[in-house]
Amino acid sequence: MRKLAFFLFVVSLALFRGQAHAQRCLPGMKGIRLTAGMADGFYSPSSKNETSYSFGASLATYTKGGNQWVFGAEYLRRYHPYRENRIPVEQFTGGGGFFCNVLSDGSKTFFLSAGVSALAGYETVNGGKKLLSDGSTIRNQDGFVYGGAITLQAETYLSDRLVLLLYGRERCLWGGSTGHFHVQYGVGLKIMMD
């Protein structure tokens, strides 16, 4: 009976001592990233004709030191006010970049990374329609865009397979006719794979 009580005591100590963390950010580990964010300002009901949003999906592959290569695609939609209406500008981009681990805690739960990416894609203004409902003509052209982005991202592990992302990003794209720079910020989830 004493052996059983001692065994249960040791097991309970092991269970309530704390959670054991799996090894994280090892070279070759991969994760699927899903992100959503805002661009070029904050949303408010008074500025709904000028807001923009983005969605993205990418694959992150870790290298030594918690650094990572990220390759993926992103959709960004920005509205430009026009009288009582708004004109949508959409960018479909693909890109790849390298993120360098800047800061992490000892338990490998929190990471701060800085990254540089190359981007290329297509920009369309008002869905390719040149004529507006009031008879005006849009002069901006649809076309291919190219450029890059710098990113600052924070990651925190919610579990061994689920990571919460917070990011800020500055995109600079040439080739489009609606502006070069777009500031983005948002949240995302990374699902770690074996």
Residues of each region from the PLM?
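Bacterial Sec-dependent N-terminal signal peptides
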Residues: 1-28
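Short glycine/proline- and aromatic-enriched beta-strand/turn motifs that initiate or cap beta-hairpins
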Residues: 20-71, 190-194
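Residue-level detection of beta-strand scaffold positions
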Residues: 35, 52-54, 70-74, 95-98, ...
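Extracellular loop and loop/strand-boundary signature of outer-membrane beta-barrel proteins
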Residues: 42-45, 80-87, 134-140, 172-176
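Short leucine-rich amphipathic alpha-helices used at interfaces
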Residues: 133-134, 140-141, 146, 190
